[in-house]
């Protein structure tokens, strides 16, 4: 399976689609978490407690953003590699047929 995956552009693109779905899920959950934290923050928290909560949420949001960027990087790499593999495969077939 793993060796076929590395030489199957369709499987690579399918996997890229899965990474996109994962990235979207992480983004959606981070958005929900941020909205929930905003509701808590507006519910009577003030001063140092509110600032600490906001700082923590900002750090967590950045961590989720990093995860999304990493997932998108893998997705983009898989699509790029699938395209390169197909181009090389076509070039090889042309050379062999001439």
From Swiss-Prot:
Q: What is its main location?
A: secreted
Q: Where in the cell is it found?
A: Secreted
InterPro entries reported for this sequence: ESAT-6-like_sf, T7SS_ESAT-6-like
Pfam families referenced in this protein's UniProt entry, alphabetically: WXG100
Q: Which GO terms describe its cellular component?
A: extracellular region
Which keywords appear in this protein's UniProt record, sorted alphabetically? Answer: Secreted
- Family listed: Belongs to the WXG100 family. CFP-10 subfamily.
User: What protein name does the entry list?
Assistant: ESAT-6-like protein EsxM
């Amino acid at each position: 399976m793993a060796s076929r995956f590395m030489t199957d552009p369709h499987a690579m693109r399918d996997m890229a689609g899965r990474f996109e779905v994962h990235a979207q899920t992480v983004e959606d959950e981070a958005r929900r978490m941020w909205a929930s934290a905003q509701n808590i923050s507006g519910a009577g928290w003030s001063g140092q407690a509110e600032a600490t909560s906001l700082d923590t949420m900002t750090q967590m949001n950045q961590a989720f953003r990093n995860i999304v960027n990493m997932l998108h990087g893998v997705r983009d790499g898989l699509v790029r590699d699938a395209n390169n593999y197909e181009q090389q495969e076509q070039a090889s077939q042309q050379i062999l047929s001439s």
